[in-house]
Amino acid sequence: MIQPQTHLNVADNSGARELMCIRIIGASNRRYAHIGDVIVAVIKEAVPNMPLQRSEVIRAVIVRTCKELKRDNGMIIRYDDNAAVVIDQEGNPKGTRVFGAIARELRQLNFTKIVSLAPEVL
């Protein structure tokens, strides 16, 4: 469960290392975001000499959360960290690689480019 002021790791090579959630996109008063939700975030830590800089406001899609995700078949998935992938306005990833495992639910939410870049889909 991601809410405003939550810090997230970045799971791609876009140049950002750490994000802080500012807003959850989709509803005016939603409190929490889960896997597959799009958020507005600010870059708190960035790699030097990359296109994305610190204090830049960007959009990102959540790919991993510490809070468990329950599937319809009863399986529960939980990750060790909260992570997101930086996306542009059309929903395409800004990076060319995705690090770590991501959930299968992203494929149903039309983030197929992120799923194809991921090394492991759970």
Curated annotation (Swiss-Prot):
InterPro entries: Ribosomal_uL14, Ribosomal_uL14_bac-type, Ribosomal_uL14_CS, Ribosomal_uL14_sf. PROSITE patterns: RIBOSOMAL_L14. GO terms for biological process: translation. The keyword Ribonucleoprotein applies. GO terms for molecular function: large ribosomal subunit rRNA binding; structural constituent of ribosome. Keywords: Chloroplast, Plastid, Ribonucleoprotein, Ribosomal protein, RNA-binding, rRNA-binding. Its main location: plastid. Pfam families: Ribosomal_L14 (PF00238). Binds to 23S rRNA. This is Large ribosomal subunit protein uL14c.
